[in-house]
Amino acid sequence: MTLSLDLLLGFALFALVTSITPGPNNTMLLASGVNFGFNRTIPHMLGITCGFFVLVVAVGFGLGAVFQTYPLLYTVLRYVGAAYLLYLAWKIAHSGPMSESQQSEAKPISYLGAAAFQWVNPKAWIMAIGAISTYTPMQGYFTNVIVIAAVFAIINLPSVGVWAACGTLLRSVLKDRRWLRLFNWGMAALLVVSLYPLLLESFS
């Protein structure tokens, strides 16, 4: 089976839905758009897309099989990711209104930081494994992995950009200190809530 047009279109829809729906990346981009603006959030966006591209390729080239052989590695990675996500939620919750000088000194998540985060992002792993296991034909497998990863990246970048843009549009609405604090606490809470699948699995 080759990567037909029908299969590619089906995958493109999968990539769009999973990229644009809420998750840790998009929640952080929305908060970054509000706190730093769109332009300063661009490295964060590019880091997400490039880091995710590498993750999909790695899963396709055998990293998934390594985790099946050594499940403890995957478990450790997931809990490290959960701990990092809680740290990011804490940072967002405590990022209050800033003066112009404070905004210039404060730093949004960097390109490398966003790229590295994909390796501990539970939703990114689910997306990558789903793409490889469901939409990658075995005939011409390695070429298809690259195509799948590239198409995912092409769709992912504008999808996550929508969230950063929405955050930027909200800046004028959230000039009031109280509303901005409530917004940041809300975004932090959503990040914590995004860990519920891991918690359910841990206690099941």
Predicted regions and their residues:
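Selected transmembrane alpha-helices and immediately adjacent juxtamembrane segments
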Residues: 118-123
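Transmembrane alpha-helical segments that form the membrane-embedded catalytic/substrate-channel core
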Residues: 88-92, 155-161
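Juxtamembrane transmembrane-helix termini in multi-pass membrane transport proteins
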Residues: 2-75, 127-152, 162-164
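Juxtamembrane boundary at the C-terminal end of a transmembrane helix
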Residues: 2, 196-204
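Membrane helix-loop-helix hairpins that form the core translocation module of multi-pass transporters
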Residues: 40-110, 166, 173, 186-189, ...
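Transmembrane alpha-helical segments of integral membrane proteins
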Residues: 157-172
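Extracellular loop architecture of rhodopsin-family
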Residues: 135-142, 176-182, 203-204
